[in-house]
Structures are given as structure tokens and as C-alpha cells.
């Protein structure tokens, strides 16, 4: 019997770490850049992993995929990042099957975000799936699951107010700057790096600070020019960084590098400087704290800022969870259908074989054998039997795997 469902000896796992137990330094070790992700996917393919997706953001690094043992996925993560198995064991989590599915739904719908209702992660999940599919590393289960999570995310965003109000890491950054820097509209603000959080922060700064002294610097100048063009900002060459740092009152770092891009040595300051490091791994060396006139604030500090908006969002968690449960149940029904469909087809084929043998026997035995009537009655009986089995397997109370095993044994499928 052909089996087009999940391989029996493979389990669906979610492995990873996030802001809840892993601090910025540890998350930095396990962060995966574009090249490392490409290497990881290629290695997974070489090692016979059937299907997986990889996400790495400021707040979490996770792998969702099929394996005989979770260590296969943990090994992939550690070998393609600066993290170790020992570090992983201290702060990470491993979920399997239904728990792994539930975790992906919570992550993708913003319920597990560092700032509740922040939907940025869903775009990362979409990208991760597209990258895996391009390498034939996304089976039908993964495709259906990711699409279900996207559907839940859209429904929650549309049907609840869990993402209402301007609350995100980028908005928290702007709130912090506005509260802690007097006369912000007259200050020199320097954005170094144009990562997504940096771009969003820049847009929020322009909108809320009414500041016309925002300068962008990026290693790749055309990216900075593209953003500056939209917002009517100043762009400077990377070579001018040290000069612009001396002019700045506020520095927002969003370079997304694997090592610090700002340290004590580069800061030759003549006035106080507020630095916001919005990067994982940290892109500002902690040695800048040795300078008297520097205030360093990291992404994790900003994420702890709570306000009325977040408290209001919490009221919508039950409604969001109800939507997740509904779509998860639809996914489970589809998954069970995928499991038992081959068994029902095989059962029907087996009953038809039994029928044909019996009809041959009756033709020889009876001189007035009614072929048409016998076919009609037999087919109706077979359909009724298979329907009974199908309805049993569809029942929520049924232990599907166990029932399939019994059917296979009884009918020798």
C-alpha cells in the first residue's frame, strides 16, 4: 500500500531558543545570517532531512522540521551558528508533534512575540518556507501548516484588536528617545545600518519627532539612499562614520552584523550620546559604557517598556486563541485525512478483490446468476463498509494511528 503521509519513523519537531530564557548574548551566538541559513538548508538536504524551515530574528532562532531524533536538528543549528550544544541545553526548548504545531501557531500569530501582537515574525516564516521550498525541503504537511498559520495570523489581525495601537520594538525605541532626549526635533540623529527594525524606527522617528537632522549610513550606500529617498533624509558614506558620530546626539545601530560595529575606540565624543542597539547579535561593544557621556540601551531593555496599549492588547488574547484553535482543528482534520486516506483506499481495493473472487465462484455455481444485480449489491455493501471505517477515523475521539494499525492487520493491507 502506497503511503503519501508523514513518514512513520519521523517526528515533527520545533527546536530553538527565544527571549524568554536566552539573553541577547546567547541569542547572538545562535543567530543565523543569510549565508549560514543557506549552508544549513544544504546540509539538511545532504543529511536526508525531509522537510524543515529555519527562522532567525532578534528575538528567536528556531527550526521546525522532521527528524528521527531532535538532535539531528539541534546539530544543524549548532554547526551553522556560534552556539554550542551545551549552551542550547541550558536555554532552549524542544517540542514535538502537536506541541510543535501549537508553538508555531503562537509564534506566527504574535502571541509569543516579545511585544504582544507584534506580527513581524509572520513575514520571516513566509520567507523561511519559500527558501525551503526552493530546495525541495518543504513537504505537503509543512506547506499546509505554514498556510494555516498565515491564515490564523490574518484572521487575528483582522478580527481582533490584539495588534491595535503603535506598539513594537521600533515604536518603543522612538518612545524612549522622545522621553529621554529634550528638544528632539533639534538634535542630530544618526541611523547606522538599515535592517528592518532600523528602517521602522527611522520611519517612526520622522513621523513623531518632526526632526530634519536624521542621517543614514550603511555599508551598502544604495540601501540607505533608497530609504532616505522615501523619507527625505541625509545619506553619508560609510567612510564618514567617525565624523558623523562626533556630530550625533542619538545613534541608532541596526547593522545586523555578526560582530560589534561600534566600540569605544571609534567614539571620539565631544558631547553626550544616546546609543540604541537594535541588533542581535549585539552590534555595540559593551566597552562604550566606560565612556562617561554615553548611554547605551539595548533592544531587550526597550522590549520591557509596557504601556496602556499592551495592557489593552492582553484583553484580546482569548479571542485570538479561539481563532487559533479553530484553524488548528481544520489542520488536524486535514492531517488525519492524509493519514487514513491510503488505508481507506487500500481497504476498498481489498474488499473489491474479495468481491471479484466471490462473484467468480457464484458464476460457476449458479446457472441463473444475475451478474448486474450482484455487482450492484456488492458495490453498495463495500461503500457502506468503507464509509463506516472512514467515519470512525474522522471521529475526534478516535486514536487514528492505532485504528489504522488494526485495520491494516485485520484486512492484511
Swiss-Prot record:
It catalyses: (S)-4-amino-5-oxopentanoate + tRNA(Glu) + NADP(+) = L-glutamyl-tRNA(Glu) + NADPH + H(+). The record marks 103 as: Important for activity. Pfam families: GlutR_dimer (PF00745), GlutR_N (PF05201), Shikimate_DH (PF01488). The keyword Heme does not apply. It is an enzyme of class 1 (oxidoreductase). Keywords: NADP, Oxidoreductase, Porphyrin biosynthesis. It comes from the Bacteria. NADP(+) binds at residues 193-198. SUPFAM superfamilies: Glutamyl tRNA-reductase catalytic, N-terminal domain, Glutamyl tRNA-reductase dimerization domain, NAD(P)-binding Rossmann-fold domains. Its EC number is 1.2.1.70. Pathway: Porphyrin-containing compound metabolism; protoporphyrin-IX biosynthesis; 5-aminolevulinate from L-glutamyl-tRNA(Glu): step 1/2. The active site is at residue 58. One of its GO terms (biological process) is protoporphyrinogen IX biosynthetic process from glutamate. GO terms for molecular function: glutamyl-tRNA reductase activity; NADP binding. Substrate binds at residues 57-60, 113, 118-120, 124. Belongs to the glutamyl-tRNA reductase family. Homodimer. During catalysis, the active site Cys acts as a nucleophile attacking the alpha-carbonyl group of tRNA-bound glutamate with the formation of a thioester intermediate between enzyme and glutamate, and the concomitant release of tRNA(Glu). The thioester intermediate is finally reduced by direct hydride transfer from NADPH, to form the product GSA. Possesses an unusual extended V-shaped dimeric structure with each monomer consisting of three distinct domains arranged along a curved 'spinal' alpha-helix. The N-terminal catalytic domain specifically recognizes the glutamate moiety of the substrate. The second domain is the NADPH-binding domain, and the third C-terminal domain is responsible for dimerization. Catalyzes the NADPH-dependent reduction of glutamyl-tRNA(Glu) to glutamate 1-semialdehyde (GSA). This is Glutamyl-tRNA reductase. The lineage of its organism: Bacteria, Pseudomonadati, Bacteroidota, Flavobacteriia, Flavobacteriales. The gene is hemA.
Amino acid at each position: 500500500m502506497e503511503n503519501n503521509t508523514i513518514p512513520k519513523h519521523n517526528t515533527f519537531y520545533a527546536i530553538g531558543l527565544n527571549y524568554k530564557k536566552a539573553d541577547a548574548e546567547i541569542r547572538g551566538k545562535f543567530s543565523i545570517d543569510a549565508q549560514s541559513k543557506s549552508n544549513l538548508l544544504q546540509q539538511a538536504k545532504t543529511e536526508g532531512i525531509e522537510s524543515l524551515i529555519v527562522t532567525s530574528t532578534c528575538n528567536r532562532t528556531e527550526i521546525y522540521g522532521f527528524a528521527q531524533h531532535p538532535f539531528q536538528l539541534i546539530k544543524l543549528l549548532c554547526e551553522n551558528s556560534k552556539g554550542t550544544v551545551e549552551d542550547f541545553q541550558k536555554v532552549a526548548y524542544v517540542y514535538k508533534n502537536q506541541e510543535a504545531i501549537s508553538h508555531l501557531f503562537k509564534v506566527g500569530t504574535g502571541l509569543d512575540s516579545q511585544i504582544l501582537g507584534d506580527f513581524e515574525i509572520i513575514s520571516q516564516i513566509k520567507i523561511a518556507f519559500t527558501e525551503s521550498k526552493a530546495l525541495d525541503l518543504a513537504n505537503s504537511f509543512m506547506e499546509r501548516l505554514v498556510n494555516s498559520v498565515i491564515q490564523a495570523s490574518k484572521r487575528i489581525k483582522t478580527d481582533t484588536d490584539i495588534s491595535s495601537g503603535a506598539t513594537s520594538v521600533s515604536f518603543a525605541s522612538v518612545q524612549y528617545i522622545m522621553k529621554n532626549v529634550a528638544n528632539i526635533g533639534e538634535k542630530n540623529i544618526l541611523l547606522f545600518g538599515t535592517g528592518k527594525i532600523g528602517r521602522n524606527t527611522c520611519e517612526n522617528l520622522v513621523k513623531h519627532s518632526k526632526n530634519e537632522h536624521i542621517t543614514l549610513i550603511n555599508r551598502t550606500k544604495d540601501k540607505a539612499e533608497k530609504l532616505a529617498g522615501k523619507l527625505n533624509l541625509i545619506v553619508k558614506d560609510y567612510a564618514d562614520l567617525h565624523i558623523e558620530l562626533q556630530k550625533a546626539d542619538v545613534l541608532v545601530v541596526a547593522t545586523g552584523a555578526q560582530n560589534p560595529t561600534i566600540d569605544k575606540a571609534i567614539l571620539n565624543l565631544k558631547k553626550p550620546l544616546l546609543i540604541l542597539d537594535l541588533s542581535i547579535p549585539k552590534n555595540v561593544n559593551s566597552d562604550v559604557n566606560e565612556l562617561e557621556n554615553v548611554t547605551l540601551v539595548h533592544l531587550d531593555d526597550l522590549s520591557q517598556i509596557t504601556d496602556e496599549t499592551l495592557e489593552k492588547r492582553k484583553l484580546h488574547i482569548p479571542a485570538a486563541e479561539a481563532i487559533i484553535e479553530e484553524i488548528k482543528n481544520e489542520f488536524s482534520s486535514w492531517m488525519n485525512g492524509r493519514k487514513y486516506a491510503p488505508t481507506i483506499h487500500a481497504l476498498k481495493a481489498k474488499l473489491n478483490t474479495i468481491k471479484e473472487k466471490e462473484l467468480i465462484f457464484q458464476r460457476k455455481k449458479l446457472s441463473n446468476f444475475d451478474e448486474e444485480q450482484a455487482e450492484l449489491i456488492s458495490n453498495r455493501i463495500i461503500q457502506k463498509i468503507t464509509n463506516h471505517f472512514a467515519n470512525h477515523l474522522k471521529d475526534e475521539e478516535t486514536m487514528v494511528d492505532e485504528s489504522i494499525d488494526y485495520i491494516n492487520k485485520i484486512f492484511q493491507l
